[in-house]
Structure formats: C-alpha cells, structure tokens
Amino acid sequence: MLDAERQTLNKRMILPTTYMGSVEWYRQFLANPSAVQIEVMESFPKQTYRNRCTITTPDGPLTLSVPVKRADSKQLTRDVEISYQQRWQHQHWIALVSAYKRTPYFDYYADFFRPFYKQETRFLVDFNEKIHEVIHQLIRNSEFKIQNSKFTTDWQGVNLEPCFGNGQSILDTLFEYGPETILKLNNVNSIKLV
C-alpha cells in the first residue's frame, strides 16, 4: 500500500446515517466531507438518531421518529424500510412549522424540506441521504442571497438561540442563521470547517 493511500485511509471517518442530523454530526461531517463514509452495513440499532431527530420547540426539545418496518434484529441499516401506516409525515411537517415558523430563515428554506413530507421513500437510508443533501447544500451555499428581505430581527424577548449540544438537529441552527450557519458551526470550538 502506498503512503498516500494509507494516509487517505487513516483520514476516513465513518458516521451513521441520521434523520436531520445533529449539530455535532454536521460539524464532524463538514470538517472533511470527502473523507466521510456513511455506515449502512451495520445491524440497525433501535432508538438512535438513524430514524430520529430532536428539534427545539417553545415547550422544549421534541423528538421526531420516522417509523420503520423491522424484519429481525440482524437487519442491516441499508435494508430498513420506512413504514407509512401512520401519518408521521404530516405530524413531522406540522411540528417543524410550529417550531420554526418564527425563525428568520424558515420561510426561505421551507420549500426545500416540504417535499420530504409529501412523497414516500422506501428505504430509510435513501430518505436520510436526500435530506442530508439538501441540508449540506444549504449550509455550504454561501451564495444564497435573500432577495427583497422584509423580515424583522426584533423578536421581542423570544429566545430563538439554537442549542449547539444535546443532540439537537442542525435545523435549529439552519433556520435561525441561514447562510451564516457555517460560521456559527465554526465558532462552536476551534475546529475549522472546510
């Protein structure tokens, strides 16, 4: 094995698939996106962020879970199918609107997320990957310009400061800071994101 290949392998980072990943997950991912491999060959563990996310609401943290079909305990993550027996998509969308409608960037980004709650995707990893692609694009798109902005930043005492810990979804930060999300993630600690 060549030294360059060995260095590349040593720099690889394996992350689990996540449903609207946490701030911490995106900080790890954005530190070196080309070195990240999403783990899909593991046995699917229950009660993890692979099919859950935690958002901040006025009443405190709210966990949203994507229901999945389970064949057996040894089922690989890549084979986990989403269950549509419940109206979870409608419930999740209502929760997102309720939690974020008063944040500065929700109106600008909502249309990027709405389709995920209208259409069905068979496999959880595919669903997560599609959402991740949108989030990554929005975070990295420094040329995103808000045209004819009319929103006010006077929130009259409402604390909309996103939580950077406790597994909170990246959506808290994205809807609050919009194109400045990458800058806010850089300020969490001294790791410089590329």
Q: What are the residue ranges of the model-derived segments?
A:
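Residues lining hydrophobic/aromatic ligand-binding pockets adjacent to catalytic sites
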Residues: 2-194
